[in-house]
Amino acid sequence: MSRYIVNGEVYIEHRFLKKTIKIEDGKLIILPPDAPIEDGAEVYNAAGKKVVPGFIDVHTHGAVGVDVNAATAEDYEKICRFAAGNGTTSWLCSVLTDTKEQTEWCIDEYKKHQKMEHKGANLLGIHLEGPFLSSEYKGAMPEHLLQKANMPLLKEYQDRAEGNIRYITISPEVEGLIDDIPAMKELGITVAIGHSGADYDT
């Protein structure tokens, strides 16, 4: 059965327009506001509301009492359901700099979650926040666990994650890191700058 969202202002091409949305076979079809509605269809009246795409959260350390660094597969599901109820349709679990053993445990629990049937937001992959971060701008990161560039370790993590580390936060001023960015990208990881005092020349 098709579903429709009517009378809302739909965010399209950087502006809000009065449109009807038809949801069919998991796809969204944008229709004119006066498009006819199929008999028997489920209709949601969004009058006075804005309709936007689901948000993708690439930096989530936890929610509903769950800390990603200690989360089980079942805990990830709690976050998925909470996120979906608050407008986030996809997310990355952000693993803080931790011991090798704990980071591997986080990866393993993520993989278990991927094999579960679940509802809610889609857990797209893993975001590693560290361990290649500046001690000067460490924030909440445990300084004794921060490291210089270590591609063998990152490759080991990515192999264990079966390619599901999607994003890493690094401080480019950390010794050896700038030269390793191309190799990180070759592993399928998007590289972001954080916990950094890097200037334009870096």
Language model features by range: what are they?
Residues M1-V6, V10-V52:
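Histidine-rich, glycine-flanked metal-binding segment
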Residues K49-A71:
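Di-metal (Zn2+ and/or Mg2+/Mn2+) metal-binding site signature of metallo-dependent hydrolases
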Residues H61, E77-C106, A121-S134, A161-E173, ...:
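Divalent metal-dependent hydrolysis catalytic cores, especially in the metallo-beta-lactamase
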Residues E101-K112, G139:
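Metal-dependent catalytic neighborhoods of phosphoester/phosphodiester hydrolases
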Residues H113-A121:
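A glycine-rich helix N-cap at a beta->alpha junction
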